[in-house]
């Protein structure tokens, strides 16, 4: 009996030691700064933008943020988290925001060199609960949407900060939007000091994921699953659904006064030249997933795919695309354009620089 007792005591001590060791080893990525790595420029990057001041900023895995003033020499930024980052927006040369997993919203005040946390999943859960609780109390039996949303927010808090933001777009240094999984829509009008939940204003009763937000004339457009396209109505403050001809997932939207281009799964893309009143299917020449797109200065559009392809439209109407020769098949997830038809794409192998002016000259 004494031997069994001693063995049990030893087992308990060993388990406690293991638990203590595990607690010591685990570091919450929301509280752990991104590690500096010489390989950050060739590791997984998901989003990229070019600031109004001409700087390139890319974001990606484990909190990696890179910046460059010439698209050749890249520098790693100081980032207070090590969660995956997926999107970045700079409305001015110095002020920018990045979003990603764990409900993270980061802000930079120095052109992307360093970042601070404005929101994370722990505070996001409390924000959602505070928003939905009074609406749930007023909800009728026939319209239980707010009650279900409150239950979902409470479950989110219990399970931990795993809900991601998937995109961010700022109009100016004060006003911006962040969107994400399960109809997550936030807006700020004070540079991110406070965030307002707008999810109840969206025509998205199934709480579909929102993959991208784009701005046109200070108006927000959101795209997501099951062909969802939402247009902000400045008069009512609601995000109203626009009918689209495709029932699959949209991963991106290009919004210009002369063109709206939706793109997503299986090489599917549709163009509208009348603000979404009518749509024409686009010949992309691929069955691969279209992950991101951007406009060149001459109006042509460039798209990148999960197959690692770079597609360029023949003209500004974006009715037909052709493949630009690339020397890799690594997936591409983000694209931004600069002067003289230069483009920076990011993906599984990090940063790629393309000279699309040279491609046009060789045709």
Predicted regions and their residues:
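Bacterial N-terminal signal peptides that target proteins for export
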Residues: 1-8
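N-terminal signal peptide c-region/cleavage motif recognized by signal peptidases
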Residues: 14-21
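Residue-level hotspots at or immediately adjacent to binding/recognition sites across diverse folds
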Residues: 21-363
């Amino acid at each position: 009996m004494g031997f069994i007792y001693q063995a049990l005591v030893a087992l308990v001590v060993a388990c406690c030691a293991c638990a203590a060791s595990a607690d010591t080893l685990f570091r919450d990525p929301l509280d752990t700064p991104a590690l500096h790595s010489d390989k950050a420029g060739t590791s997984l990057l998901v989003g990229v933008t070019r600031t109004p001041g001409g700087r390139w900023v890319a974001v990606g895995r484990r909190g990696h943020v890179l910046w460059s003033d010439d698209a050749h020499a890249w520098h790693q930024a100081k980032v207070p988290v090590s969660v995956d980052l997926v999107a970045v927006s700079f409305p001015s040369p110095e002020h920018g925001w990045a979003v990603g997993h764990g409900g993270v919203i980061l802000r930079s005040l120095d052109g992307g060199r360093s970042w601070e946390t404005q929101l994370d999943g722990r505070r996001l859960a409390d924000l959602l609960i505070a928003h939905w609780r009074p609406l749930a109390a007023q909800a009728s039996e026939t319209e239980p949407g707010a009650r279900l949303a409150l239950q979902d927010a409470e479950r989110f808090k219990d399970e931990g900060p795993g809900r991601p933001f998937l995109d961010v777009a700022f109009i100016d240094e004060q006003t911006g939007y962040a969107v994400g999984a399960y109809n997550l829509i936030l807006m700020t009008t004070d540079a991110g000091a406070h965030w307002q939940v707008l999810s109840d204003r969206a025509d998205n009763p199934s709480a579909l994921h929102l993959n991208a937000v784009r701005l046109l004339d200070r108006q927000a457009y959101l795209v997501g699953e099951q062909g969802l396209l939402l247009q902000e109505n400045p008069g009512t403050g609601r995000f109203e659904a626009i009918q689209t001809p495709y029932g699959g997932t949209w991963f991106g939207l290009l919004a210009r006064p002369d063109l709206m281009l939706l793109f997503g799964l299986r090489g599917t893309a549709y163009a509208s030249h009348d603000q979404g009143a009518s749509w024409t299917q686009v010949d992309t020449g691929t069955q691969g997933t279209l992950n991101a797109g951007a406009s060149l200065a001459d109006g042509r559009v460039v798209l990148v795919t999960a197959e690692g392809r770079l597609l360029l439209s023949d003209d500004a109407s974006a009715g037909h695309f052709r493949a630009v020769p690339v020397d890799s098949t690594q997936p591409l997830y983000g694209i931004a354009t600069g002067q003289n038809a230069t483009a920076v794409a990011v993906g599984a192998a990090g940063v790629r620089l393309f000279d699309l002016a040279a491609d046009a000259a060789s045709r």
